[in-house]
Swiss-Prot record:
This protein is synthesized as a Gag-Raf polyprotein. ATP binds at I30, G31, S32, G33, S34, F35, G36, T37, V38, K50. The active site is at D143. Keywords: ATP-binding, Kinase, Nucleotide-binding, Oncogene, Serine/threonine-protein kinase, Transferase. One of its GO terms (molecular function) is protein serine/threonine kinase activity. PROSITE patterns: PROTEIN_KINASE_ATP, PROTEIN_KINASE_DOM, PROTEIN_KINASE_ST. Residues 24-284 form the Protein kinase domain. This is Serine/threonine-protein kinase-transforming protein raf. Belongs to the protein kinase superfamily. TKL Ser/Thr protein kinase family. RAF subfamily. Its EC number is 2.7.11.1. Pfam families: PK_Tyr_Ser-Thr (PF07714). InterPro entries: Kinase-like_dom_sf, Prot_kinase_dom, Protein_kinase_ATP_BS, Ser-Thr/Tyr_kinase_cat_dom, Ser/Thr_kinase_AS, Ser/Thr_Kinases-Pseudokinases.
């Protein structure tokens, strides 16, 4: 019965992206994140396999997961980690391109890579470009942070771990998936408060991006003076604390400083959206002396059509700080 081929017209579009567990060989365990464990694997070459923390998914969860996969498979952009397929046997899992580069978190806070200001601005632009693309596809990232941004072959940004609301949401009834404990620093106040059934929005992604921008422009994580995670949750959730902009580099352009301030506004309606964010960074780049502009990559201009299957790491990032 199982092996009978259904007429083509009756197939869910996600059917063609389903992988059999037997086809994918898992090798090294790379690390564990808020929503699952990442392995390096082989499937016609190197891939990253994320086994999601969803035990015994309900039929509703399974269908919601398939619906989301149908959206993810349509994503093709130079600044987005390529989605390659999914598995449902034993565990829900997604398969993406493998990437040898380090996460932005690792570059900034572990290796302490010394970037020049024009490079930091370009990382910010590419990240905004990738996020603008996701939002245009109506995909909310829900876990945007420096651990989920990878620098591939030098300075090409790849955003990973996007979408998958099924896994990142609380489910009523027996299935409850807790909010990520490691991502507190990047969570918008309204997400921390969790007063709405679904506090995630384009604006909550913008807030998280604002924290990434702060990391780029300060070289450190926000709230470094508060080493108590619960205190950060309380202070940010109530609107008593926001990133200290006096910590930004002295040579940080005013336009970027304003952008950080706007992105992390406590009232979500006051935050800009990615088309505006991207425009303001591009405007700034055009005003910089030519010697400080990074060489444009031809691939960036055909981003929407690019199918970049080069290797890209899903997570070589270290453990998150206690917050």
């Amino acid at each position: 019965e199982k092996n009978k081929i259904r007429p083509r017209g009756q197939r869910d579009s996600s059917y063609y992206w389903k992988m059999e567990a037997s086809e994918v060989m898992l090798s090294t365990r790379i690390g564990s994140g808020s929503f699952g464990t990442v392995y390096k694997g082989k499937w016609h070459g190197d891939v990253a396999v994320k086994i999601l923390k969803v035990v015994d998914p309900t039929p509703e969860q399974l269908q919601a997961f398939r619906n989301e996969v149908a959206v993810l498979r349509k994503t093709r952009h130079v600044n987005i980690l390529l989605f390659m397929g999914y598995m449902t046997k034993d565990n829900l899992a997604i398969v993406t391109q493998w990437c040898e580069g380090s996460s932005l978190y690792k570059h900034l806070h572990v290796q302490e890579t010394k970037f020049q200001m024009f490079q930091l601005i370009d990382i910010a632009r590419q990240t905004a470009q990738g996020m603008d693309y996701l939002h245009a596809k109506n995909i909310i990232h829900r876990d945007m942070k420096s651990n989920n941004i990878f620098l591939h072959e030098g300075l090409t940004v790849k955003i990973g771990d996007f979408g998958l609301a099924t896994v990142k949401s609380r489910w009523s009834g027996s299935q409850q998936v807790e909010q990520p404990t490691g991502s507190v620093l990047w969570m918008a106040p309204e997400v921390i408060r969790m007063q709405d059934d679904n506090p995630f929005s384009f604006q909550s992604d913008v807030y998280s991006y604002g924290i990434v921008l702060y990391e780029l422009m300060a070289g450190e994580l926000p709230y470094a003076h508060i080493n108590n995670r619960d205190q950060i949750i309380f202070m940010v959730g109530r609107g008593y604390a926001s990133p200290d902009l006096s910590r930004l580099y002295k040579n940080c352009p005013k336009a970027i400083k304003r952008l950080v301030a706007d992105c992390v506004k406590k009232v979500k309606e006051e935050r800009p959206l990615f088309p505006q964010i991207l425009s303001s960074i591009e405007l700034l780049q055009h005003s910089l002396p030519k010697i400080n502009r990074s060489a444009p990559e031809p691939s960036l201009h055909r981003a929407a059509h690019t199918e970049d299957i080069n290797a890209c790491t899903l997570t070589t990032s270290p453990r998150l700080p206690v917050f």
